[in-house]
Amino acid sequence: MTTPHVPAIHVQSLEKAYKNVGVLRGVDFDVARGSIFALLGSNGAGKTTLVNILSTLLKADAGTASVNGFDVATQAADVRESISLTGQFAAVDEILTGRENLMLIARLRHLKDPGTIANDLLERFALTDAAERKVSTYSGGLRRRLDIAMSLIGYPPVIILDEPTTGLDPQARIEVWQVGKELAEHGTTVLLTTQYLDEAEQLADRIAILHQGRIIENGTLAELKQLLPPAKIEYVEKQPTLEDVFLAIVGDEGKDLPTLAMTAASAQKGEEQR
């Protein structure tokens, strides 16, 4: 059931309605093992409902879905053993340290040597320096990284990142993006739900656009770009965005400051040539 030929997630003709209002209207997609699959849609598109069905928290009205080869309706216990769900609300205990949070989850899952498990995850997610601090002192980015580390205890083959960067500042978002990429590099299958276009573009191997309860497009970034008309060559003056300015100022030891200066200089030169 869990051979490489079987998709990590398989969804077929999935439907769900609330009081005769269709939320999911025949959703179909597959997620390949070890890949990052982005489910892109605005608020109300049906992303959360779909995640709740895949994580066995909600039953579909019609259609089928499987995770790691297990049917979400008839093999719910096996599905729950195969996945971990984390998102915009970090499920951490603020009165405990980072290490204590990790060890607590390892003990609750009856795993051997919780201390070693915690140390390995602290190192993997660059949390060693913050390991002995109470989580109440953590920044948003640190909390999110700890939450994702906690979700990997027990090594679930599939992790669902549900709106993982909502409410984070630009630097913390980039930190979470890096964690997502590392998960896939280690063989974990990642289902990412997001409403941020840049997030899907940066992370996903494939992107499905969910709109009004239906998948209206599904493909790689290159395939989706082919849906647009042929590109036209235009000469424009590009000014740095506020995010460019922010990251240039607070980047690692100011290494991006020359980039900001070059961007401004290039823009000025382009204006002079025009």
Predicted feature locations:
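ABC ATPase "signature
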Residues: 218-219
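Catalytic Walker B motif of ABC-type/P-loop ATPase nucleotide-binding domains
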Residues: 159-163
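Conserved ABC transporter NBD signature motif
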Residues: 63-74, 78-79
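Conserved ABC ATPase "signature" region
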Residues: 84, 103, 107-130
